């Protein structure tokens, strides 16, 4: 649901732009790429490092790390880049209540962005 919320909120007239390659595609054909890979809980839900990426960049080109880093530095600065890289090593345990609240928040955002569940 987080992926859908990010893609819908990033879309302009239903189109998202890949942050690493620059191509534009319908939001349903775009993925939510993580700046820091590894899918650890410390960064998995940190939206400051999740942006639209095309399938080719996110999967076929393993996230386009150097290009993603340039995007992050230009738009958010070295401080956030360093923080997200450091968070990769941190374990975060969410309670069932926290996860339910996150899901409800994502559902609301999807609805507000004009999407359906």
Show where each model-derived region lies:
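Charged phosphate-binding loop/patch that engages nucleotide di/tri-phosphates or the phosphate backbone
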Residues: 87-117
């Amino acid at each position: 649901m987080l992926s859908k919320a990010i893609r819908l909120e990033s879309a302009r007239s239903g189109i998202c732009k890949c942050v690493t390659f620059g191509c534009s595609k319908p939001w349903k054909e775009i993925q939510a790429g993580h700046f820091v890979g590894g899918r650890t809980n410390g960064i998995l839900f940190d939206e400051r490092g999740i942006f639209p990426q095309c399938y080719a960049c996110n999967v076929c080109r393993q996230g386009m790390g150097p290009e993603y880093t340039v995007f992050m530095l230009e738009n958010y600065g070295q401080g956030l880049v360093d923080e997200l890289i450091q968070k990769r090593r941190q374990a975060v345990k969410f309670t069932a209540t926290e996860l339910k609240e996150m899901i409800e928040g994502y559902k609301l955002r999807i609805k507000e962005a004009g999407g359906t569940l």
